[in-house]
Regions:
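His/Asp/Glu-enriched, well-ordered alpha-helical/loop segment
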Residues: 1-63
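C-terminal cap of metal-dependent C-N hydrolases
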Residues: 35-37, 41, 54-100
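A short C-terminal boundary segment appended to hydrolase-like catalytic domains
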Residues: 100-106
Length: 106
């Protein structure tokens, strides 16, 4: 994620997955796979992370809708599990100007 770019925020990785699906034509499932299991494989970390398995580190999010149906469901994170801790309804400071402009491409 290019955090230093003014039009890419630290909280909008879901958009990159959505654009990958919309503009390249991959399935929602494949977009999620590339961001998790495949990314860990390319980073040489597939034995440590990238999937939810016994003995692996597993940071994950909970959303109310199914991202396999619509990747925009990832926009509304209800819970985060990270390093064994729960963050319930995480608060994220959102740049409204950036969001409004980027929403034009959804």
């Amino acid at each position: 994620n290019d955090v230093g770019c003014p039009w890419v925020s630290q909280y909008d990785f879901w958009r990159e997955l959505y654009y990958f699906h919309k503009y390249i034509g991959v399935s929602n499932c494949f977009a999620l796979y590339t961001a998790t299991s495949l990314a860990s494989k390319y980073a040489g970390l597939e034995d440590v992370t990238g999937s939810i398995d016994v003995g692996k580190e597993a940071d994950m999010i909970v959303v109310s809708e199914n991202p396999l149906d619509d990747l925009k469901a990832l926009r509304h994170v209800e819970k985060v599990f990270t390093r064994g801790k729960l963050i319930d309804h995480p608060k994220v400071k959102i740049n409204k100007i950036v969001e409004t402009e980027l929403d034009k491409y959804l």
